[in-house]
């Protein structure tokens, strides 16, 4: 692998060896209502993660061969947090393909509203990369003023160091479902 021309890879004799393309990834923003609070499920990236070690993010990962996007969302959720999500409850949000924001991936974003009874159990998490996730937890990020209006606790969110702009994406995605006040 001596030389790259655009996404093509050539050896030193000019023979094309293959090409590089962007990967498809999923991001799953998991929320639940607990009493009068809205919580988000976040993971802290462990020492086995490819990048952004020690930073918080929502569930995210790559699409495997022979897998649908919703299958990838369910698999990544279980691998990284132990939560089994019902793919019928996944809500598609957007596709981020802007190379200036994310050169490596085309990311499909989903939101999932868990029931209070749905929980995670990291000890049940299977697969994934070794030590990819250090910890997983539910974090209070807003208080319900009404069923469709949230008072967002921005200072609490910004005490944490986020990977992949997930702090901004959490707010962006919530604004599609709730009126947000600060």
Language-model regions: role of each:
Residues 33-39, 50-52, 87, 102-104:
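Short, solvent-exposed loop/turn segments that connect beta-strands within catalytic domains
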Residues 1-36:
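Acidic, metal-coordinating catalytic segment for phosphate/diphosphate chemistry
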Residues 53-54, 127-182:
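Nudix hydrolase/Nudix homology domain
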Residues 37-79:
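Conserved Nudix-box catalytic region and its N-terminal flanking loop in Nudix hydrolases
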Residues 84-94:
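A short coil-to-beta-strand element that immediately follows conserved catalytic motifs
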Residues 16-20, 101, 128:
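Short Gly/Pro-enriched turn/cap motifs at secondary-structure boundaries
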Residues 95-124, 137, 142-143:
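Active-site-adjacent beta-strand/loop module that shapes the phosphate/pyrophosphate-binding cleft
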């Amino acid at each position: 692998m001596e030389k790259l021309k655009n996404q093509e890879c050539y050896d030193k004799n000019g023979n094309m060896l293959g090409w590089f393309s962007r990967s498809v990834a999923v991001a799953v923003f998991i929320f639940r209502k607990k009493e009068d609070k809205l919580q988000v499920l976040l993971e802290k990236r462990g020492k086995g993660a490819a990048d952004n070690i020690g930073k918080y993010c929502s569930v995210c990962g790559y699409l495997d061969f022979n897998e649908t996007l919703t299958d990838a969302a369910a698999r990544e959720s279980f691998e990284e947090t132990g939560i089994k999500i019902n793919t019928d409850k996944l809500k598609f949000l957007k596709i981020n393909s802007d190379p200036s924001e994310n050169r490596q991936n085309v990311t499909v974003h989903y939101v999932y509203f868990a029931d209070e009874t749905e929980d995670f159990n990291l000890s049940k998490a299977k697969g994934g990369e070794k030590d990819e996730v250090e910890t997983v937890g539910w974090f209070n990020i807003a208080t319900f003023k009404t069923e469709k209006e949230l008072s967002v606790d921005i200072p609490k969110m910004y005490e944490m160091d986020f990977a992949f702009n997930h702090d901004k994406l959490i707010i962006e995605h919530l604004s599609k479902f709730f009126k947000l006040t600060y």
